Protein backbone atom coordinates (compact mmCIF):
# COMPACT_ATOMS: atom_id res chain seq x y z
CA UNK A 1 0.00 0.00 0.00
CA UNK A 2 1.31 3.35 -0.90
CA UNK A 3 2.00 5.92 1.73
CA UNK A 4 -0.51 8.75 2.15
CA UNK A 5 2.24 11.40 2.28
CA UNK A 6 2.77 13.40 -0.89
CA UNK A 7 6.27 12.78 -2.37
CA UNK A 8 8.58 15.68 -1.62
CA UNK A 9 10.96 15.05 -4.52
CA UNK A 10 10.47 13.51 -7.97
CA UNK A 11 12.92 10.74 -7.05
CA UNK A 12 10.87 9.52 -4.06
CA UNK A 13 9.82 5.84 -4.30
CA UNK A 14 6.40 5.14 -5.78
CA UNK A 15 3.77 2.83 -4.22
CA UNK A 16 4.62 -0.84 -4.09
CA UNK A 17 3.30 -2.77 -7.08
CA UNK A 18 3.09 0.33 -9.28
CA UNK A 19 5.59 0.43 -12.18
CA UNK A 20 8.02 3.32 -11.51
CA UNK A 21 7.53 4.83 -14.95
CA UNK A 22 9.19 8.12 -14.07
CA UNK A 23 12.26 6.40 -12.61
CA UNK A 24 12.70 4.27 -15.73
CA UNK A 25 12.59 7.33 -17.90
CA UNK A 26 15.24 9.12 -15.87
CA UNK A 27 17.50 6.07 -15.89
CA UNK A 28 17.11 5.64 -19.64
CA UNK A 29 18.06 9.26 -20.13
CA UNK A 30 21.19 8.91 -17.99
CA UNK A 31 22.35 5.77 -19.80
CA UNK A 32 21.91 7.40 -23.19
CA UNK A 33 23.87 10.41 -22.03
CA UNK A 34 26.76 8.32 -20.71
CA UNK A 35 26.90 6.24 -23.92
CA UNK A 36 26.96 9.29 -26.12
CA UNK A 37 29.62 10.91 -23.91
CA UNK A 38 31.91 7.87 -24.40
CA UNK A 39 31.37 8.00 -28.18
CA UNK A 40 32.09 11.72 -28.17
CA UNK A 41 35.38 11.20 -26.33
CA UNK A 42 36.45 8.62 -28.95
CA UNK A 43 35.44 10.93 -31.77
CA UNK A 44 37.28 13.84 -30.18
CA UNK A 45 40.51 11.84 -30.21
CA UNK A 46 40.13 11.28 -33.97
CA UNK A 47 38.58 14.69 -34.91
CA UNK A 48 40.29 17.97 -35.58
CA UNK A 49 37.39 19.85 -33.83
CA UNK A 50 35.79 20.79 -37.16
CA UNK A 51 32.44 19.55 -35.77
CA UNK A 52 32.36 22.06 -32.87
CA UNK A 53 30.12 25.11 -32.97
CA UNK A 54 31.74 28.30 -34.36
CA UNK A 55 31.94 29.78 -30.86
CA UNK A 56 34.82 27.50 -29.92
CA UNK A 57 36.91 28.71 -32.91
CA UNK A 58 37.61 32.16 -31.45
CA UNK A 59 41.19 31.14 -30.68
CA UNK A 60 41.49 32.43 -27.11
CA UNK A 61 41.81 29.16 -25.13
CA UNK A 62 44.01 26.22 -26.15
CA UNK A 63 42.44 23.48 -28.26
CA UNK A 64 42.50 20.98 -25.41
CA UNK A 65 40.43 23.28 -23.17
CA UNK A 66 37.93 24.08 -25.97
CA UNK A 67 36.78 20.47 -26.06
CA UNK A 68 35.10 20.60 -22.64
CA UNK A 69 32.31 23.14 -23.35
CA UNK A 70 31.26 21.35 -26.52
CA UNK A 71 31.16 18.00 -24.76
CA UNK A 72 29.04 19.40 -21.92
CA UNK A 73 26.60 20.97 -24.36
CA UNK A 74 26.21 17.74 -26.30
CA UNK A 75 25.78 15.81 -23.07
CA UNK A 76 23.04 18.22 -21.98
CA UNK A 77 21.24 17.90 -25.32
CA UNK A 78 21.58 14.13 -25.27
CA UNK A 79 20.06 13.95 -21.80
CA UNK A 80 17.06 15.93 -23.03
CA UNK A 81 16.41 13.75 -26.08
CA UNK A 82 14.18 11.10 -24.42
CA UNK A 83 11.76 13.71 -22.98
CA UNK A 84 9.62 14.20 -26.12
CA UNK A 85 8.40 10.61 -25.64
CA UNK A 86 4.76 10.17 -24.45
CA UNK A 87 4.42 11.40 -20.88
CA UNK A 88 3.67 8.81 -18.19
CA UNK A 89 0.84 9.06 -15.67
CA UNK A 90 0.68 12.56 -14.15
CA UNK A 91 2.09 12.94 -10.68
CA UNK A 92 0.17 16.09 -9.79
CA UNK A 93 -2.47 15.93 -7.08
CA UNK A 94 -5.96 17.03 -8.09
CA UNK A 95 -7.72 19.04 -5.37
CA UNK A 96 -11.25 17.74 -5.92
CA UNK A 97 -13.16 20.22 -3.74
CA UNK A 98 -10.64 23.06 -3.68
CA UNK A 99 -10.16 22.91 0.10
CA UNK A 100 -7.20 20.52 0.21
CA UNK A 101 -9.18 17.93 2.19
CA UNK A 102 -9.90 15.56 -0.69
CA UNK A 103 -7.18 14.95 -3.30
CA UNK A 104 -6.61 12.45 -6.09
CA UNK A 105 -3.50 11.37 -7.99
CA UNK A 106 -3.39 8.96 -10.93
CA UNK A 107 -0.97 6.08 -10.40
CA UNK A 108 -1.79 3.97 -13.46
CA UNK A 109 -3.87 5.62 -16.21
CA UNK A 110 -6.73 3.81 -17.87
CA UNK A 111 -6.27 2.34 -21.35
CA UNK A 112 -6.71 4.65 -24.36
CA UNK A 113 -10.36 5.28 -25.17
CA UNK A 114 -11.64 4.30 -21.74
CA UNK A 115 -14.59 6.28 -20.39
CA UNK A 116 -15.54 7.68 -17.01
CA UNK A 117 -18.57 6.49 -15.03
CA UNK A 118 -21.61 8.69 -14.49
CA UNK A 119 -24.13 9.03 -11.69
CA UNK A 120 -26.51 6.10 -11.48
CA UNK A 121 -24.10 3.54 -12.91
CA UNK A 122 -23.05 0.50 -10.90
CA UNK A 123 -19.27 0.44 -10.48
CA UNK A 124 -16.89 -2.24 -9.24
CA UNK A 125 -13.64 -1.17 -7.61
CA UNK A 126 -10.69 -2.77 -5.89
CA UNK A 127 -10.14 -0.76 -2.72
CA UNK A 128 -7.22 -0.70 -0.31
CA UNK A 129 -7.68 1.53 2.74
CA UNK A 130 -4.79 2.76 4.90
CA UNK A 131 -4.30 5.22 7.71
CA UNK A 132 -2.06 8.26 7.25
CA UNK A 133 0.88 6.38 8.75
CA UNK A 134 0.63 3.72 6.03
CA UNK A 135 -1.07 1.03 8.14
CA UNK A 136 -3.42 -0.94 5.91
CA UNK A 137 -6.75 -1.46 7.66
CA UNK A 138 -9.02 -2.81 4.95
CA UNK A 139 -8.97 -4.37 1.48
CA UNK A 140 -11.99 -5.08 -0.70
CA UNK A 141 -11.19 -6.76 -4.03
CA UNK A 142 -14.75 -6.43 -5.41
CA UNK A 143 -16.59 -3.47 -3.90
CA UNK A 144 -19.83 -2.82 -5.84
CA UNK A 145 -21.93 0.33 -5.38
CA UNK A 146 -24.17 2.72 -7.29
CA UNK A 147 -22.45 5.98 -8.07
CA UNK A 148 -24.15 8.97 -6.47
CA UNK A 149 -26.44 6.96 -4.18
CA UNK A 150 -24.25 7.52 -1.08
CA UNK A 151 -23.79 3.77 -0.67
CA UNK A 152 -20.17 4.33 0.39
CA UNK A 153 -18.11 7.05 2.05
CA UNK A 154 -18.15 10.43 0.31
CA UNK A 155 -14.46 10.19 -0.58
CA UNK A 156 -15.26 7.35 -2.99
CA UNK A 157 -18.51 8.83 -4.27
CA UNK A 158 -16.71 12.07 -5.19
CA UNK A 159 -13.44 10.69 -6.57
CA UNK A 160 -14.54 7.68 -8.66
CA UNK A 161 -16.42 9.86 -11.24
CA UNK A 162 -13.03 11.48 -11.99
CA UNK A 163 -11.42 8.13 -12.90
CA UNK A 164 -11.29 6.23 -16.18
CA UNK A 165 -12.25 2.57 -16.28
CA UNK A 166 -9.03 0.62 -15.70
CA UNK A 167 -7.35 3.48 -13.86
CA UNK A 168 -5.64 3.15 -10.49
CA UNK A 169 -5.57 6.26 -8.33
CA UNK A 170 -4.49 7.36 -4.89
CA UNK A 171 -7.06 9.37 -2.90
CA UNK A 172 -6.27 11.14 0.36
CA UNK A 173 -9.34 12.20 2.33
CA UNK A 174 -10.03 14.05 5.55
CA UNK A 175 -12.12 12.24 8.17
CA UNK A 176 -15.21 14.34 7.31
CA UNK A 177 -15.33 12.57 3.92
CA UNK A 178 -14.70 9.14 5.46
CA UNK A 179 -16.00 7.85 8.80
CA UNK A 180 -16.04 11.13 10.74
CA UNK A 181 -15.89 11.48 14.52
CA UNK A 182 -17.29 7.98 15.11
CA UNK A 183 -14.73 6.08 13.03
CA UNK A 184 -15.35 2.45 12.16
CA UNK A 185 -14.60 0.05 14.95
CA UNK A 186 -12.29 -1.75 15.41
CA UNK A 187 -9.90 -0.72 12.63
CA UNK A 188 -10.54 2.96 11.86
CA UNK A 189 -10.27 5.32 14.85
CA UNK A 190 -12.38 8.48 15.25
CA UNK A 191 -11.40 11.54 13.22
CA UNK A 192 -9.04 9.44 11.06
CA UNK A 193 -7.93 10.75 7.67
CA UNK A 194 -7.57 7.90 5.18
CA UNK A 195 -5.49 7.01 2.16
CA UNK A 196 -7.41 5.04 -0.49
CA UNK A 197 -5.85 3.17 -3.39
CA UNK A 198 -8.69 2.64 -5.87
CA UNK A 199 -8.76 0.65 -9.09
CA UNK A 200 -11.89 1.19 -11.17
CA UNK A 201 -12.65 -2.18 -12.75
CA UNK A 202 -16.06 -1.79 -14.41
CA UNK A 203 -18.92 0.66 -14.79
CA UNK A 204 -22.32 -0.51 -16.08
CA UNK A 205 -25.78 1.03 -16.21
CA UNK A 206 -27.97 0.60 -13.15
CA UNK A 207 -30.92 -1.81 -13.12
CA UNK A 208 -34.33 -0.95 -14.57
CA UNK A 209 -36.59 -0.96 -11.51
CA UNK A 210 -39.67 -1.89 -13.53
CA UNK A 211 -38.03 -5.09 -14.76
CA UNK A 212 -36.81 -6.32 -11.37
CA UNK A 213 -38.28 -9.51 -9.96
CA UNK A 214 -39.69 -9.58 -6.46
CA UNK A 215 -36.54 -11.07 -4.94
CA UNK A 216 -34.33 -8.58 -6.80
CA UNK A 217 -36.41 -5.74 -5.39
CA UNK A 218 -36.08 -7.15 -1.89
CA UNK A 219 -32.30 -7.52 -2.27
CA UNK A 220 -31.87 -3.99 -3.66
CA UNK A 221 -34.07 -2.40 -0.98
CA UNK A 222 -32.25 -4.30 1.76
CA UNK A 223 -28.87 -3.06 0.50
CA UNK A 224 -30.08 0.55 0.55
CA UNK A 225 -31.60 0.09 4.01
CA UNK A 226 -28.32 -1.32 5.34
CA UNK A 227 -26.46 1.66 3.88
CA UNK A 228 -28.93 3.93 5.66
CA UNK A 229 -28.36 2.09 8.93
CA UNK A 230 -24.59 2.53 8.56
CA UNK A 231 -25.00 6.27 7.97
CA UNK A 232 -27.40 6.53 10.93
CA UNK A 233 -24.91 4.83 13.25
CA UNK A 234 -22.31 7.42 12.21
CA UNK A 235 -24.86 10.16 13.02
CA UNK A 236 -24.95 11.20 9.36
CA UNK A 237 -28.72 11.57 9.30
CA UNK A 238 -28.92 13.36 5.94
CA UNK A 239 -27.25 10.46 4.10
CA UNK A 240 -29.28 7.99 6.15
CA UNK A 241 -32.54 9.61 5.07
CA UNK A 242 -31.35 9.57 1.45
CA UNK A 243 -30.61 5.82 1.58
CA UNK A 244 -34.00 5.02 3.15
CA UNK A 245 -35.70 7.10 0.45
CA UNK A 246 -33.90 5.07 -2.24
CA UNK A 247 -34.97 1.83 -0.57
CA UNK A 248 -38.62 2.96 -0.52
CA UNK A 249 -38.36 3.99 -4.17
CA UNK A 250 -37.08 0.52 -5.09
CA UNK A 251 -40.04 -1.04 -3.25
CA UNK A 252 -42.85 1.20 -4.49
CA UNK A 253 -41.86 1.77 -8.14
CA UNK A 254 -44.15 0.27 -10.75
CA UNK A 255 -43.41 -3.29 -11.83
CA UNK A 256 -43.77 -5.06 -15.16
CA UNK A 257 -42.92 -8.42 -13.61
CA UNK A 258 -45.46 -10.44 -11.64
CA UNK A 259 -44.70 -11.10 -7.98
CA UNK A 260 -45.98 -13.74 -5.62
CA UNK A 261 -48.08 -13.00 -2.55
CA UNK A 262 -45.14 -13.87 -0.31
CA UNK A 263 -42.87 -11.42 -2.16
CA UNK A 264 -45.45 -8.63 -1.85
CA UNK A 265 -45.81 -9.29 1.88
CA UNK A 266 -42.03 -9.27 2.25
CA UNK A 267 -41.80 -5.94 0.41
CA UNK A 268 -44.53 -4.45 2.62
CA UNK A 269 -42.66 -5.43 5.79
CA UNK A 270 -39.48 -3.93 4.34
CA UNK A 271 -41.32 -0.72 3.42
CA UNK A 272 -42.59 -0.33 6.99
CA UNK A 273 -39.05 -0.76 8.35
CA UNK A 274 -37.66 1.83 5.95
CA UNK A 275 -40.44 4.33 6.72
CA UNK A 276 -39.87 3.92 10.45
CA UNK A 277 -36.13 4.46 10.04
CA UNK A 278 -36.77 7.41 7.73
CA UNK A 279 -39.00 9.00 10.38
CA UNK A 280 -36.26 8.53 12.98
CA UNK A 281 -33.74 10.28 10.71
CA UNK A 282 -36.15 13.12 9.95
CA UNK A 283 -36.84 13.54 13.66
CA UNK A 284 -33.10 13.87 14.31
CA UNK A 285 -32.94 16.56 11.60
CA UNK A 286 -35.94 18.44 13.09
CA UNK A 287 -37.91 17.86 9.89
CA UNK A 288 -41.14 17.42 11.83
CA UNK A 289 -43.66 17.64 9.00
CA UNK A 290 -41.78 15.04 6.95
CA UNK A 291 -41.41 12.78 10.00
CA UNK A 292 -45.14 13.08 10.74
CA UNK A 293 -45.93 12.08 7.16
CA UNK A 294 -43.62 9.04 7.36
CA UNK A 295 -45.21 7.89 10.63
CA UNK A 296 -48.70 8.31 9.19
CA UNK A 297 -47.76 6.14 6.19
CA UNK A 298 -46.61 3.40 8.54
CA UNK A 299 -49.84 3.58 10.53
CA UNK A 300 -51.87 3.28 7.33
CA UNK A 301 -50.39 -0.20 6.86
CA UNK A 302 -50.00 -1.13 10.55
CA UNK A 303 -52.24 0.94 12.88
CA UNK A 304 -50.74 -0.74 15.95
CA UNK A 305 -47.09 -0.20 15.06
CA UNK A 306 -45.59 0.90 18.38
CA UNK A 307 -42.54 2.61 16.89
CA UNK A 308 -44.67 4.70 14.54
CA UNK A 309 -47.08 5.64 17.34
CA UNK A 310 -44.25 6.60 19.66
CA UNK A 311 -42.46 8.71 17.02
CA UNK A 312 -45.68 10.38 15.91
CA UNK A 313 -46.36 11.33 19.53
CA UNK A 314 -42.84 12.75 19.83
CA UNK A 315 -43.23 14.75 16.62
CA UNK A 316 -46.52 16.26 17.79
CA UNK A 317 -44.95 17.06 21.15
CA UNK A 318 -42.06 18.83 19.42
CA UNK A 319 -44.65 20.92 17.59
CA UNK A 320 -46.35 21.81 20.89
CA UNK A 321 -49.46 19.74 20.14
CA UNK A 322 -49.59 18.07 23.55
CA UNK A 323 -53.35 17.46 23.47
CA UNK A 324 -52.89 15.35 20.31
CA UNK A 325 -49.64 13.68 21.34
CA UNK A 326 -50.85 12.38 24.72
CA UNK A 327 -53.67 10.12 23.36
CA UNK A 328 -51.28 8.64 20.78
CA UNK A 329 -48.68 7.80 23.41
CA UNK A 330 -51.40 6.32 25.63
CA UNK A 331 -52.41 4.07 22.74
CA UNK A 332 -48.79 2.96 22.33
CA UNK A 333 -48.50 2.32 26.07
CA UNK A 334 -51.69 0.25 25.98
CA UNK A 335 -50.07 -2.00 23.37
CA UNK A 336 -46.88 -2.36 25.41
CA UNK A 337 -47.54 -1.46 29.07
CA UNK A 338 -44.03 -2.42 30.23
CA UNK A 339 -42.22 -0.02 27.90
CA UNK A 340 -40.34 2.37 30.18
CA UNK A 341 -39.44 4.75 27.34
CA UNK A 342 -43.09 5.35 26.51
CA UNK A 343 -43.91 5.75 30.22
CA UNK A 344 -41.22 8.41 30.63
CA UNK A 345 -42.23 10.30 27.48
CA UNK A 346 -45.91 10.25 28.40
CA UNK A 347 -45.22 11.50 31.93
CA UNK A 348 -43.09 14.32 30.54
CA UNK A 349 -45.81 15.36 28.09
CA UNK A 350 -48.53 15.37 30.74
CA UNK A 351 -46.46 17.78 32.84
CA UNK A 352 -45.74 20.00 29.85
CA UNK A 353 -49.41 20.00 28.90
CA UNK A 354 -50.41 21.08 32.42
CA UNK A 355 -47.84 23.87 32.34
CA UNK A 356 -49.11 24.94 28.92
CA UNK A 357 -52.72 25.15 30.15
CA UNK A 358 -51.64 27.15 33.18
CA UNK A 359 -49.80 29.60 30.95
CA UNK A 360 -52.81 29.94 28.64
CA UNK A 361 -55.13 30.55 31.60
CA UNK A 362 -52.91 33.32 32.91
CA UNK A 363 -52.80 34.84 29.44
CA UNK A 364 -56.61 34.82 29.13
CA UNK A 365 -56.96 36.53 32.50
CA UNK A 366 -54.49 39.20 31.49
CA UNK A 367 -56.32 39.82 28.21
CA UNK A 368 -59.68 40.15 29.99
CA UNK A 369 -58.33 42.49 32.64
CA UNK A 370 -59.63 40.27 35.46
CA UNK A 371 -56.64 38.52 37.00
CA UNK A 372 -58.54 37.57 40.19
CA UNK A 373 -60.86 35.00 38.68
CA UNK A 374 -61.72 33.39 35.38
CA UNK A 375 -65.11 31.84 34.53
CA UNK A 376 -64.77 28.08 34.44
CA UNK A 377 -66.43 27.31 31.14
CA UNK A 378 -66.15 30.25 28.81
CA UNK A 379 -63.60 32.99 29.32
CA UNK A 380 -65.12 36.31 28.34
CA UNK A 381 -68.73 35.28 28.97
CA UNK A 382 -69.26 37.85 31.76
CA UNK A 383 -67.93 40.65 29.62
CA UNK A 384 -70.55 40.04 26.93
CA UNK A 385 -73.56 38.89 28.97
CA UNK A 386 -75.01 42.36 29.86
CA UNK A 387 -74.78 43.90 26.36
CA UNK A 388 -76.55 40.88 24.84
CA UNK A 389 -79.36 41.10 27.39
CA UNK A 390 -79.95 44.76 26.56
CA UNK A 391 -79.90 43.96 22.87
CA UNK A 392 -82.49 41.19 23.16
CA UNK A 393 -84.69 43.40 25.38
CA UNK A 394 -84.62 46.29 22.94
CA UNK A 395 -85.45 43.96 20.08
CA UNK A 396 -88.46 42.54 21.95
CA UNK A 397 -89.79 46.03 22.72
CA UNK A 398 -89.42 47.09 19.09
CA UNK A 399 -91.21 43.98 17.82
CA UNK A 400 -94.01 44.52 20.35
CA UNK A 401 -94.47 48.11 19.20
CA UNK A 402 -94.70 47.05 15.57
CA UNK A 403 -97.26 44.38 16.39
CA UNK A 404 -99.38 46.82 18.40
CA UNK A 405 -99.34 49.33 15.52
CA UNK A 406 -100.51 46.65 13.10
CA UNK A 407 -103.42 45.66 15.38
CA UNK A 408 -104.57 49.27 15.84
CA UNK A 409 -104.39 49.93 12.12
CA UNK A 410 -106.46 46.82 11.41
CA UNK A 411 -109.22 47.89 13.81
CA UNK A 412 -109.46 51.36 12.26
From Swiss-Prot:
GO CC entries: cytosol; endomembrane system; endoplasmic reticulum; endoplasmic reticulum membrane; membrane; mitochondrial envelope; mitochondrial membrane; mitochondrion
Gene name per UniProt: FKBP8
PROSITE patterns assigned: FKBP_PPIASE, TPR, TPR_REGION
Xref: Gene3D superfamilies: 3.10.50.40, Tetratricopeptide repeat domain
Cysteine-cysteine disulfides: none
Residue spans of biased composition, Acidic residues class: 22-50
Domain PPIase FKBP-type: 120-204
Species whose genome carries this gene: Homo sapiens
Keyword annotations from UniProtKB, A to Z: Apoptosis, Calcium, Host-virus interaction, Isomerase, Isopeptide bond, Membrane, Metal-binding, Mitochondrion, Phosphoprotein, Repeat, Rotamase, TPR repeat, Transmembrane, Transmembrane helix, Ubl conjugation
Transmembrane segments: 390-410
Record cross-link Glycyl lysine isopeptide (Lys-Gly) (interchain with G-Cter in ubiquitin), residues: 249, 271, 273, 284, 307, 314, 334, 340, 348, 351-352
GO biological process, one term: dorsal/ventral neural tube patterning
Subcellular locations according to the entry: Mitochondrion; Mitochondrion membrane
Enzyme class: isomerase
Lineage: Eukaryota, Metazoa, Chordata, Craniata, Vertebrata
EC number, UniProt record: 5.2.1.8
GO terms, molecular function: calmodulin binding; disordered domain specific binding; identical protein binding; metal ion binding; peptidyl-prolyl cis-trans isomerase activity; protein folding chaperone
Keyword Lyase attributed: no
A Pfam family it matches: FKBP_C
Reactions mediated catalytically: [protein]-peptidylproline (omega=180) = [protein]-peptidylproline (omega=0)
Record PTM text: Ubiquitinated by PRKN during mitophagy, leading to its degradation and enhancement of mitophagy. Deubiquitinated by USP30.
Modification Phosphoserine, positions: 296
Entry protein name: Peptidyl-prolyl cis-trans isomerase FKBP8
